[in-house]
Amino acid sequence: MILLTLLLISSIAIVSAIDTDSSDNQILSVEKSVNQNIFKINHPPENHHELNDLNPTKKSVSKNFDFFGIFDFLFKGEKKYGYWVWSGDMDKVDFDKLSKNGVNVVFLNSYAFKDHGYKDVMNWIKKANDHGIEVHIWMQIFNTGEWISPVKNGTPNTGYFNYKIEEAKYYAGLEGVSGLQMDYIRYEGNAYKDPNGTAAINEFVKNYTKSVKEVNPSLTVSATVMPEANATYYYGQDIPKMGEYVDVIVPMMYKGNYESDSEWTKNTTDWIVKHSGDAKVWVGLQTYQSDFNVTDMPADELLKDGKFAFDNGADGVIYFKWGMNEELDNKKLN
């Protein structure tokens, strides 16, 4: 308690010393940079649109002073570092190396149960846990090889919703599973054609989270989102509303697909954090150049983007995918 009191007193002194004029100039610079950015969608390619409604407000002092990292640690918890792991890569994962490099969470694709069998997957989960690594089951919701509409005959596709929720409840009850990861919780890019689509997705996310937490209240539920201001219009993803239901928002910040740079990563992380409510934000970073150039992203560039993500409010960094840049030294970001 004495330590916290001293920290609070020191923080007040720091806040009072801020140069307001200088801060305002920095904000104008950030606003200009963000509004000049172009968000490009990999598919469908015709859906390119400007990020014209981002208007970041002043960043909190905690993002500008390392001193406040103490508060982040005390109140936000440990930073998360992890990988999405495809079923086909499951047996190749080296937990010794991952643990050594600071990885503490993996998203294992749910098809691993079909491809490897229950026993092998459970042994894999236990091995991960023994290395201090959480396992979250990564589920593909509205795309399992083909797109499935969240709406059927103008109303929520409840039959399909119930099917996926029952599947999720099964995973939620497995020993050693720490979380569930909803991927493809969206439209392909044509949500604007369905006026009930966003509401249907919100209903699914709400019911999914409620149902799995009835099985295991300690589960961490996350949802991947498109890192775009117009995510509702194109994908049916109302990020602020989703943030009311899930524990973690995972924006897919694949800058290569957007033909963007690290400045885009920084500014977009800031926007996502400000629009995710109480949900934590674990930024998804692409381990390769882009979907059009599948060569490794330089390790130092990935770590730089990870630092930008944390500096702008993220609570974790998840790399897509394991098998490329799987030996990143994440401890450099602590």
Where in this protein do the model-derived segments appear?
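Boundary/entry segment of secreted carbohydrate-active catalytic domains
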Residues: 47-98, 223-227, 288, 320
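Catalytic domains of carbohydrate-active enzymes, especially glycoside hydrolases
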Residues: 89-114, 174-179, 248, 309-317
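Active-site-adjacent "subsite" loops/lids of carbohydrate-active enzymes
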Residues: 121-129, 134-175, 300-305
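Aromatic-lined carbohydrate-recognition surfaces of secreted/lumenal glycan-active proteins
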Residues: 82-86, 136-140, 200-236, 279-290
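Aromatic-lined substrate-binding rim segments of carbohydrate-active enzymes
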Residues: 93-98, 105-143, 192-215, 219-221
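Active-site groove signature of glycoside hydrolases
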Residues: 163-196, 318
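Aromatic- and acid-rich polysaccharide-binding/catalytic face
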Residues: 108-111, 178, 183, 234-263, ...
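Substrate-binding cleft of secreted/luminal carbohydrate-active enzymes
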Residues: 253-262, 279-334
